[in-house]
């Protein structure tokens, strides 16, 4: 460990989590851009294509809690690196199905399901990293950077995949995305460590700052089992599942994240196709305007993370985590309802993009709250929460075209707007200072710190 200087290793690693987050969305959204070409090549209907989209999300949802528990037990370095390799393999396999293959639908569903299973580790692992490496006062911005990768990856996907489709065919986009993933995962494995104390480049000053931000100075038990300093092979003490499933806070944020996932995945799964097929924009114009929601997400994640930290420091976590999230999600519902009524395709794209941005203002609240209340079990608890998100996402992938076919696309967006208001209301019952760890309160409003572990 370097002691002669002050380092910022934690932020360098957060930046690489941003890269991995972007790559994960590059690998999951590419099929929504290539979906039209795939549907034409294999004679798939929109409903069948929706099943392919949903398959990834079902696999992603089913393995959230498993991925989170693995990160809790074995650390974010190994688990995340293994996940990147896994999903890189199945991204590449998406491109190998033979032309005119009669079992193409089954093949695509199976491969995308397994891709989702591998991607399930990314955000629970990132949240476990944040619980170990990032002080409470910085968690909003750190999560903002991680999820800004969603906007960056999803925003890069339409022009990149469209260009490759035009010049090299749809299969090339999956090969390129796979190679990018392998590279990003290898770099993560080389530069990351599970704890700050185990990283050779972390200075004494940075380590002390991290440790003081993760624990309550007046709690002796916290300082003895701080995950930032415990040895790599030390036993990990986790919150029992029975305490997780009895928590009102966990169920409230999971319900809200279910609604969030339903709404967000309209943009990831169907927005490009909606602009091209329903609004009548050409391929290149659709690619440009379909970038707008994702660019809005990128900016909103960073802005939301900054607001999260500042409001929490100013008035406590109820304002910084809960009220901010409720306001942002409700605002998203207003934008989406208005955007669905706009006649101009281009203006509708801008208004709907505003809805996507407003939705992502709340992103840091979900993940910062679970890190705050769960500490060493943040991977498991955030994985449980994210399961709700992915169930919502899987439902929207096939339900959105079904609603559109029977009632029109305006109805599809209005359903999403209603769910925004349900998701916003869910935050009103959350107590952000109710720790899942027995015997520990979370006086964040007073101290700016939260305990991250306890003997169970």
Ranges and model annotations:
Residues 301, 371-406:
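A late C-terminal transmembrane helix in Major Facilitator Superfamily
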Residues 54-69, 291-304:
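Central cavity-lining transmembrane alpha-helices of secondary-active solute carriers
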Residues 31-33, 242-302, 363, 367, ...:
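Extracytoplasmic gate region of multi-pass secondary transporters
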Residues 85-102, 330-343:
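C-terminal ends and interior cores of transmembrane alpha-helices
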Residues 111-151:
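Cytoplasmic helix-loop-helix junction between adjacent transmembrane helices
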Residues 150-199:
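Helix-loop-helix hairpin linking two adjacent transmembrane segments in secondary transporters
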Residues 90, 104-121, 335, 346-361:
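Hydrophobic core of transmembrane alpha-helices in multi-pass small-molecule transporters
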Residues 318-366:
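C-terminal transmembrane helical hairpin of 12-TM major facilitator-type secondary transporters
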């Amino acid at each position: 460990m370097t002691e002669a200087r002050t380092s910022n290793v934690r932020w360098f690693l957060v930046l690489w989590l941003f890269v991995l987050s972007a790559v994960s969305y590059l690998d999951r959204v590419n099929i929504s851009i290539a979906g039209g070409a795939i549907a034409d090549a294999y004679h798939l209907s929109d409903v069948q294509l929706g099943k392919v989209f949903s398959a990834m999300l079902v696999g992603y949802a089913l393995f959230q809690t498993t991925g989170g528990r693995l990160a809790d037990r074995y650390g974010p370095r190994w688990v995340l690196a293994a996940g990147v390799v896994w999903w890189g393999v199945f991204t590449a396999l998406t491109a190998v199905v033979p032309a005119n293959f009669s079992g193409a639908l089954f093949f695509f569903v199976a491969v995308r399901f397994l891709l989702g299973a591998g991607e399930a580790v990314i955000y629970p692992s990132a949240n476990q990293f944040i619980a170990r490496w990032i002080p409470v006062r910085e968690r909003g911005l750190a999560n903002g950077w991680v999820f800004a990768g969603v906007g960056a990856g999803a925003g890069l996907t339409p022009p990149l995949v469209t260009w490759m489709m035009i010049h090299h065919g749809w299969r090339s986009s999956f090969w390129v995305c796979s190679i990018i993933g392998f590279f990003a995962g290898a770099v993560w494995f080389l530069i990351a460590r599970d704890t700050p104390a185990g990283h050779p480049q972390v200075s004494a000053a940075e380590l002390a700052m991290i440790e003081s931000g993760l624990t309550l100075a007046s709690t002796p038990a916290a300082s003895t089992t701080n995950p930032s300093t415990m040895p790599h092979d030390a036993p990990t003490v986790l919150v029992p599942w029975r305490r997780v499933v009895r928590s009102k806070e966990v169920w409230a944020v999971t319900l809200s994240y279910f609604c969030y996932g339903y709404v967000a995945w309209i943009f990831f799964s169907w927005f490009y196709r909606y602009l091209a097929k329903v609004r009548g924009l050409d391929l290149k114009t659709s690619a440009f305007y379909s970038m707008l929601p994702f660019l809005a997400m990128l900016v909103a994640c960073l802005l939301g993370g900054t607001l999260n930290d500042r409001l929490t420091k100013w008035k406590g976590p109820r304002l910084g985590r809960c009220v901010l999230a409720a306001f942002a999600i409700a605002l998203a519902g207003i934008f989406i309802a208005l955007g669905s009524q706009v006649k101009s395709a281009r203006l509708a794209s801008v208004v709907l993009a505003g809805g996507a941005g407003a939705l992502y203002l709340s992103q840091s609240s979900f993940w910062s709250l679970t890190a705050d209340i769960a500490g060493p079990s943040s991977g498991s608890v955030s994985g449980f929460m994210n399961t709700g998100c992915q169930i919502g996402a899987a439902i929207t992938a096939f339900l959105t075209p079904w609603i559109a076919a029977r009632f029109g696309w305006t109805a599809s967006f209005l359903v999403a707007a209603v769910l925004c208001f349900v998701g916003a209301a869910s935050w009103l019952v959350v107590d952000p200072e109710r720790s899942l760890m027995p015997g520990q309160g979370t006086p964040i409003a007073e101290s700016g710190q939260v305990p991250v572990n306890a003997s169970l």
